[in-house]
Amino acid sequence: YKKLGHSRDMALRVYTTRLLGRNSELVLHGGGNTSVKTTVKDLDGKNYDVLCVKGSGWDMAEIEPEGLPAVKLNPLLALKNKKKLSDEEMVAYQKRNLINIKSPNPSVETFLHAFLPFKFVDSTHSDAIMSVTNRPNGITFCKKIFGKKVSIIPYVMPGYGLAQKIKEVYLKNPNINCLILLNHGIFTFSNDAKESYDLMIKYVSDA
């Protein structure tokens, strides 16, 4: 990837995304998202902090750098304290801040990935996790199984509202390294690509 002008950050992100995507027990029906926070140089010669997050239409198992569109990070973070944002406003804002406007639409979970203050964020719809969370007493089971490093969140529809909820949960529990959203899936995060991937495997195995 270096020969093609891509950074080590991007190479690691592509590699671990493929690892997750090729595990059918982790990614149901192609679902899941990954991201990396890094810097890129635009045509104006300036370096921008960006969030490269999986774009719509891309399969994690076969992801390429082009499937992780770069969105300017600071404009995303500028909305951190905004209470509400409609789906239409959210999509338009994300597209407006793409480095390359021809890139695929960024994930509906873009703000969620931006608000978690870690370089690498992984999200999957693991069937093992779902088998625990989808029970009537899912929260109780999750707390027993996963311990204090994991926060359990009742289901919120993916979008800006979920991003705000996860931001609030993380601020109250800054020592966590995993979030489980009932009836949806699991998020792991770290400043190290391997650690974020390993955490995903660990918690799914625990389930």
Language-model-derived ranges and their functions:
Residues Y1-A207:
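Glycine-rich flexible loops
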